[in-house]
Amino acid sequence: MATVNKIWLQLGQSWNNGQGGNLHLLQTAYNKRMINVRIMTDNGFECIYPTSNNNQYPTANQNDGVSIEFYFQDIAEHLGEDVYLVKYAQGSTRLQFDNTRTDWNVASVGELYDGTITAINDAISWMNTRGKQYSFEGVVWCQGEGDCIPLSAANEYQQNNIDLMAG
């Protein structure tokens, strides 16, 4: 039986994007090439390698930051298999529709939700081209403070999150 490659979506704002200039803060165990954790980049899935800063996708959002993807090494070791990540994150965003700045709202055209769908389709294409079986295992969503300020964003958060996950 062929291996089913497990893909996780890592989406969100602020700290999920990774904060700039702090790769040196990674514990030694995580500050190395991670052969069992692959992250989607402009070139397809690559092993996470902190010194190459390939953990920031899309590259337009690169800022030399650390976030949760480095710790997926623990999940890969626990499962005894490789983990694939599709990360799409950008700081200073919210789920609430906002026509003055980029947001995650599914009603926004050409913004973060649409970019996420493109990244997912790129991952599917990469797997299919290589004849790999895959399944999407879950979503790791990191909320930012933009979803609690203003109050209207907080009041709409539950429904906006349901809409995002339902796609």
Task: For the regions a language model picked out, list residue spans one by one.
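Cell-envelope and extracellular/periplasmic
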Residues: 1-167
